[in-house]
């Protein structure tokens, strides 16, 4: 259990280090208006906090920096609520009301807003497909041998897939196929599409569509691609402006992980409605040992759909960043729910 004096000093050190990125000494702490202790007293308390694992001492400095244990305590017990300014709230609202008509467009926009407001990396997971159901399928010819397959889900999500057609598939067969798919697959979960396609739709196609096996194979591949949940990014190079990431090899390792959507999906995905903060080693990814990840979920029509997140240094401006993520998750939920109700 930390004393009140230790709590004040720990909070002062974390706040100063977040602001300056420089180790914090007892003299600079003693100059703060909210600290009334002498430099000698502060030094003793800093030594105790270091011994307890809340602070670390860089080799080349007399000052201290927060450890990951220190950041965790700071986030869990010392963080005061932060309210976005009216200007910041207006900025988010304005960007979200600029003719956004599709779910994916709204999600892409939220990634850009997050990265521009925080100066960190934003990661937004597209709607989870486990419970998402197909509403309708459309096919629009592009050329004599290719069409765009448009999927519309019950949440208003619209996805396009280009399908290349062999010469043996004719327009009449395509029209029949679309009618059969909409009749048989509307309301089916995206994760059950392939199963339904092979068990129920195949028998119907066999009687109505020439070269039905070829059409079936093309549809299977298209449906399989549709099951994947997309990951959207913003500000991937923002970490380059942070002083602790001047090591080229460290940046390379981080960017390599950011290119692996499956890894990022597992790391960012949130199952709860509350803000989640993972610090350093809590991310369970070696390249993210010096990074913190803040996430919140968003919903559509009251149903949990995806996650928005921020990746930044452990020396992150937690108060403001948490507030931005929280505010944006609520605004995105409202926007997507409105789009869902209009669809």
UniProtKB/Swiss-Prot annotation:
GO terms for molecular function: DNA binding. Keywords: Repressor, Stress response, Transcription, Transcription regulation. GO terms for biological process: negative regulation of DNA-templated transcription. Gene3D superfamilies: 3.30.450.40, Heat-inducible transcription repressor hrca homolog, domain 3, Winged helix-like DNA-binding domain superfamily/Winged helix DNA-binding domain. It holds the Pfam family HrcA. Transmembrane segments: none annotated. InterPro entries: GAF-like_dom_sf (IPR029016), HrcA (IPR002571), HrcA_C (IPR021153), WH-like_DNA-bd_sf (IPR036388), WH_DNA-bd_sf (IPR036390), WHTH_HrcA_DNA-bd (IPR005104), WHTH_transcript_rep_HrcA_IDD (IPR023120). It comes from the Bacteria. Negative regulator of class I heat shock genes (grpE-dnaK-dnaJ and groELS operons). Prevents heat-shock induction of these operons. PANTHER family: HEAT-INDUCIBLE TRANSCRIPTION REPRESSOR HRCA. Belongs to the HrcA family. This is Heat-inducible transcription repressor HrcA. It comes from Halalkalibacterium halodurans (strain ATCC BAA-125 / DSM 18197 / FERM 7344 / JCM 9153 / C-125) (Bacillus halodurans).
